[in-house]
């Protein structure tokens, strides 16, 4: 199965099993807007809980808030979003489709990287154990040719980004022979800037002065509440403020399922520190956030850092944690050193003094800030895309299984009476009563036990508990493990402790520091 095929199958699986639905589907849906179903909302909430508790419980100096979506419009003037929150837009005249010019160039560069890696893979296969990858990359003529092409285009692209040269964007697209994937032509319009903020009116007068925005990020809610949190919480520098919430961006091209949407959810933390110490904390949060991801057990090889060559207007250092999605390595989380840009600008525009008096140094200053920002929806997609597997079984059949990290699984345990008679459902209900206050569970007595196992595999349930006739005699049940399919007999009295050991969020959190 190719990566494209896997992605299509995954999207269909999400709908079939209640993870994600196209929003307003009875009205033919709305492009790039999705609803989370009964399984999806549980997984999403577990992801958010893992992040929230890792921030606010594992760090004594990080606290949380929940700010509003609507904020005073001057907030977005101070943050720079009104003037500079734009993407470069280009249209194909033949297909009438719209694209981000920078994405077209980045996809072109990505294809060159793929060619290089395929050449390396061929060399590895040809030379076996004697393969010297470093030397091969330095001497292979095909790789050297592709590297030279990559560097030439990449250097032009970086220069165009830094200069905000829209004409050069288009010229790179033309020089590289980049064509529209639908029409196959290079009949492009000029590149122009497109502001990504949604706006509305706060009253019914329609007056331009009533214009407000749907927040494009949650971070500004933290910055404008900095003084309130610092004073009421008696917080000492360094400290952080965490928040989970919805944000909205009028994306030019919303694509790749829930990877890029117009309405999405962010998990952001702003860490305030003394000027001059920000790079120390930038390094700390860079390492800490990578540990958080790798701790889920989805393979360290599926993550990588990508340091920014072009920095945002507010940053003096920035890196992305990229994940290997079905469509390649893409940004999952950003870590940025934002300096004092935000607090400083809000102080100037509001006329309010936003400073911190440091009792250790006896000086007052505007704190610097290091930010970690991750999309809940992208994290959801990372977990699902890595977890989805089709396995061949010894009997010649196959099964679809979601090997979701157990603490994140929507349903932790399924209680399955072998038959709907002989007192088995009644005993199964007793088992339910043993675990219902501790775990999200499903009770299922319909169809054969094999079909019920497959249904639970498909939604990622770590344990299936079967109540059979022997259970009536020995008060034990058969517990089936999702990943190994191994089955063991366990006394009902010990069932809760056995399940808890694997699915408890606390054990997952301990792994970050272990």
PLM feature spans:
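NTP/phosphate- and nucleic-acid-binding module
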Residues: 1-514
């Amino acid at each position: 199965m190719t990566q494209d095929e896997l992605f299509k199958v995954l999207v269909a699986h999400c709908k079939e099993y209640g993870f994600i639905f196209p929003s307003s589907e009875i009205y033919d849906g709305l492009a790039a807007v999705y609803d989370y179903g009964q399984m999806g909302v549980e997984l999403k909430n577990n992801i958010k809980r893992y992040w929230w508790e890792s921030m606010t419980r594992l760090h004594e100096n990080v606290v949380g808030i929940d700010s509003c979506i609507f904020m005073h419009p001057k907030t977005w003037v101070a943050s720079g979003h009104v003037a500079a929150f734009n993407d470069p837009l280009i249209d194909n005249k033949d297909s009438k489709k719209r694209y981000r010019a920078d994405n077209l160039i980045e996809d072109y560069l990505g294809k060159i990287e793929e060619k290089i890696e395929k050449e390396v893979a061929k060399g590895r296969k040809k030379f076996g154990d004697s393969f010297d990858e470093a030397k091969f990359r330095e001497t292979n003529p095909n790789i050297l040719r592709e590297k030279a092409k990559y560097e030439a285009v990449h250097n032009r692209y970086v220069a165009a980004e830094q200069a905000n040269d829209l004409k050069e964007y288009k010229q790179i697209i033309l020089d590289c022979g980049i064509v529209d994937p639908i029409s196959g032509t290079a009949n492009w319009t000029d590149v122009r800037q497109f502001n990504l903020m949604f706006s509305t009116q706060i009253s019914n007068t329609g007056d331009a002065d009533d214009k407000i925005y749907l927040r494009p990020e949650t971070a500004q809610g933290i910055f404008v509440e900095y003084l309130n949190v610092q004073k009421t919480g008696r917080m000492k520098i360094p400290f952080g403020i965490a928040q989970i919430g919805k944000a909205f961006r009028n994306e030019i091209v919303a694509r790749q399922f829930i990877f890029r949407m117009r309405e999405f959810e962010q998990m952001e933390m702003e860490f305030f520190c003394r000027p001059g110490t920000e790079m120390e904390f930038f390094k700390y949060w860079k390492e800490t956030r990578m540990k958080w991801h790798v701790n889920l057990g989805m393979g360290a090889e599926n993550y990588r850092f990508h340091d920014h060559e072009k920095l945002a207007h507010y940053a003096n250092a920035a890196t992305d944690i990229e994940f290997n999605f079905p469509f390649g390595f893409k940004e999952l989380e950003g870590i940025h050193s934002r300096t004092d840009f935000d607090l400083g600008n809000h102080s100037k525009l509001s006329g309010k003094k936003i400073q911190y008096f440091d009792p250790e140094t006896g000086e007052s200053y505007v704190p610097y800030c290091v930010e970690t920002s991750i999309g809940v929806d992208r994290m959801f997609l990372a977990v699902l895309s890595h977890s989805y597997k089709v396995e061949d079984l010894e009997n010649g059949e196959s099964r679809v299984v979601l090997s979701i990290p157990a603490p994140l699984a929507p349903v932790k345990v399924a209680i399955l009476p072998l038959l709907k008679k002989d007192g088995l459902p009644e005993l199964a209900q007793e088992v339910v009563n043993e675990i219902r206050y501790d775990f999200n569970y499903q009770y299922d007595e319909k169809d054969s036990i094999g079909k019920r196992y497959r249904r639970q595999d498909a939604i990622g349930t770590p344990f299936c508990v079967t109540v059979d006739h022997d259970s009536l005699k020995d008060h034990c049940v058969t517990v089936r493990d999702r990943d190994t399919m191994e089955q063991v007999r366990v006394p009902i009295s010990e069932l809760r402790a056995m399940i808890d050991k694997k699915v408890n969020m606390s054990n997952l959190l301990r792994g970050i520091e272990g």
